[in-house]
Each structure stands twice: as C-alpha cells, then as structure tokens.
C-alpha cells in the first residue's frame, strides 16, 4: 500500500505541472499611443474602465472627419501584474477584447499586438475582415499560441508587458466612434517536473 501511495504521489507531481493558466486578468494601466487620422485623435478613458461591466474607453470623431478610411491611435494596455510559478514555461497567450462601433462608419480591427519589454512585437492577431456588428467580444491567440514569440516568465511578469489594439473606420461622413468595454489577458504555462520522491530520478 505504501509503494502504491508513493507511485500515485509521483504521478500527481508529474501531471500537476501541465495545462495550467492564470485567471483572466485586466490591465493596471493604459494610454493612447501615437496619433490617429480622420479626427480620431486619441482614446479617451482610463485603465479602470477596462474591466467587464464598467465604463468604456472611447475614440471618436463628431465633427472633424469625413468620408474615407481612418485609423485610431493604439490603445496600449500594460501592468497586468502576472505572477507565475518558479520555472514556468509560457505555452500560450490569449486575449479578449469587447468592443462596439457606432456612427457613420463600419469598424474593423486593424492591429492587435503584444508589447514585450514595452515594444510592440510578434504576430498581428487583428480580425481585419470582419466588421464589428453591434457589441462583440473577440478572442485572440489561445492555449498553444505564442503570437510568434518565445516570451519568458520574467517578460510576462514585467510591468511593460501588455497588448494594444488599433481600429479602422470606413466612414461615409463625420460622426463616428468606437468603444472598448474591456481588454483582458490569460497566460498558459507549464512547470517542468522535478525529481520523483519515489524513484529519486528526474522525470
């Protein structure tokens, strides 16, 4: 019986390190990065607005724009405050963004990219061909998607790690706006197994 229990304990230690993830996590800071076009000068709001069910971030033009294709600045979010176990190896990054387009324009994603070390890098996960039809929540990345990167635990935990979105408006006249209700991230990771307490060898 004792041997069986030791073997079971070893198996639990082996499997415990796989398929783990953080909870959905909201940013601790944000700002409007760069400049937009067509009167879409900046994002208005605060990072505290980017939690589910709260206020919304907004980028708008009510008088200065015109018919054409225009772009918002990047809404950059960071300071997610992740804390991963010692030895964690990142296996995937998932992002969800809830957004709505309004007014005399059809709205699309233009760019959804990560910030690592404060620099925008990796794959562009924007869903560029599908317009925002009412209020939508889109998912980018996933449990085995690293966005073309090899991020480390240290990079994920850094305050300058985050994600940004840039939107595109195909406008027929002035008076159009887009709002972001929330942006959140989830990190998937594994922890390499240590030594077996029963066999005394690495596994």
Feature-to-residue mapping (PLM):
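Predominantly extracellular/luminal cell-surface or secreted proteins
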Residues: 98, 113-117, 188-190
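Cysteine-clustered segments with highest specificity for TGF-beta superfamily mature ligands
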Residues: 61, 78-79, 93-95, 124-176
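Short, surface-exposed beta-strand/strand-loop-strand elements in extracellular ectodomains
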Residues: 105-119
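A short beta-strand element within beta-rich, extracytoplasmic domains
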Residues: 86-104, 161
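Short beta-strands within extracellular/lumenal beta-sheet-rich domains
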Residues: 67-86
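Acidic glycine-/aspartate-rich tracts in secreted/extracellular proteins
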Residues: 100-103, 119, 167-170, 191-192
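Enriched but not universal
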Residues: 2-34, 38-39, 181-203
């Amino acid at each position: 019986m004792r041997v069986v229990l030791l073997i079971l304990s070893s198996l639990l230690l082996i499997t415990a390190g796989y398929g783990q993830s953080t909870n959905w996590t909201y940013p601790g800071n944000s700002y409007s990065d760069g400049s937009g076009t067509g009167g879409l000068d900046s994002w208005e709001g605060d990072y505290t607005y980017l939690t589910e069910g709260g206020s919304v971030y907004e980028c708008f033009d009510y008088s200065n724009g015109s018919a054409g294709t225009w772009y918002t600045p990047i809404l950059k979010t960071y300071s997610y405050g992740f804390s991963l176990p010692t030895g964690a190896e990142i296996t995937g990054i998932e992002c969800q963004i809830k957004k709505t387009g309004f007014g005399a324009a059809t709205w699309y994603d233009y760019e959804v990219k990560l910030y690592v070390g404060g620099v925008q890098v990796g794959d562009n996960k924007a869903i560029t061909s599908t317009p925002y039809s009412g209020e939508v929540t889109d998912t980018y990345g996933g449990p085995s998607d690293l966005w073309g990167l090899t991020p480390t635990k240290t990079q994920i935990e850094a305050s300058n790690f985050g994600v940004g979105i840039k939107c595109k408006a195909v406008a027929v006249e002035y008076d159009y706006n887009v709002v972001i209700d929330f942006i959140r991230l989830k990190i998937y990771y594994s922890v390499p197994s240590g030594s077996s307490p029963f066999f005394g060898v690495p596994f």
